[in-house]
Amino acid sequence: MNFKFFPQTKEEIEQMLKQAGMNSLDDLYADVPEQIRFRGEYDLPEPMSETEIRSLFDKLGEKNRRLTVFAGAGCYDHYTPAVVPNIISRSEFLTSYTPYQAEISQGTLHYIFEYQSMMAELTGMDVSNASMYDGSTATAEAAIMALASTKKTDTVLLSASVDPKVLNVVKTYAHFHGFNVELIAENDGATDKEQMDARLEKGGVAGVIVQQPNYHGIVEDFSGFADSCHAHKSLFIVNSVAADLALLKTPGEWGADVAVGDGQSLGIPMAFGGPSVGYMCCTEKLMRKMPGRIVGKTVDNRGQRVFVLTLQAREQHIRRQKATSNICSNESLMALFVTIYMSVMGKEGVKEAAQMSYDGAHYLHDALIATGLFSDKYERPFFNEFCVKYNGDVDRLQQRFIENGILGGVKVDADTLMFAVTEKRTKEEIDKLVNIAKEEKL
């Protein structure tokens, strides 16, 4: 047999087999049924030199089309300061795990503590955990948290204006955890509070989940939502785009019990749907029900400041069925990413990026409406994302955008496009998109 793709030599393989008390590789694979074993030669290319491999992948990379992004729907093209990937690429940071021996990992615990502090401030909440996988799983975990925090409940309400991808993840959790998911209808693209109140009156609701801005880009008015939930012993849970909270009213200001969402908008580049980081914050009252790691600050026996994994009995040193969650890792590296991003940008920088995104989106919206080719899908305020109806062929228009190097929005139904704008988009790029739309109709 030819072992040219194995790092071990034939002699080394024979030595390892002998040590294991075997005579051949067939003995090693004896547990694998004969009918599914591969026989014959592998269809692999001949070995290449480093320069040949680099040339091959350069040619493959040239096939990629780089587009100017005006699409969002949960993943946004924000700018990443060069220092961020430079720092997180250090070997000390390249892990997604929080440490098991906290006392010897003070640096890691320190940056997680800073992340928690920043997210708690950004959301206006008391406590943050060390991160979740992404915004969808954070929302689903919040639903379970609501069920664990309330009595005689078996249902979680979600606004129909929540991102469908988030809704699907919550439904998956619900199927295996045995709780019900019910939708609150929309009224002109926003949560229908009257329907929510009517359902709360029937009882059995552990929590209500809304999104801000919602999937349509609308900035909703949640006045009275928390009061309605609390009057019926239910939790009020707000899912938000993290970057937008630099300017918007925070979940804490809306009276939320739990704030969740995706941190991708805090400078994490888009790459085939990831990586990302989910955040989860809550009130101090609910802290012991919150899943995931929590890093705390204390002093050692010499009076020196130290960081520790606190309240571990909630989710690790406990029987599985009693744990707050069975998630045993997190997105520590991406939590570090957004921590460095917010540190480098500073409060004013994060606010400025959000303001530029808001201004750019409203400039694009007004320019599209002015063409006479587009009309508003909803008559409601929006932040940096909005839905407009197009009075032509949406598919053809999107193809024209792509031909001109633009990813022009997300098609949400037969005649509607949803556009998103971030601080990366220039006036020239926005004007180019509008002009392409005009030319398409000529």
Briefly describe each language-model feature range:
Residues 1-26, 30-39:
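Compact, charge-rich alpha-helical regulatory domains located at protein termini
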Residues 205, 348-433:
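Conserved C-terminal alpha-helix-loop-beta "cap" of PLP-dependent enzymes
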Residues 266-372, 376-379:
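Active-site C-terminal subdomain of aminotransferase-like
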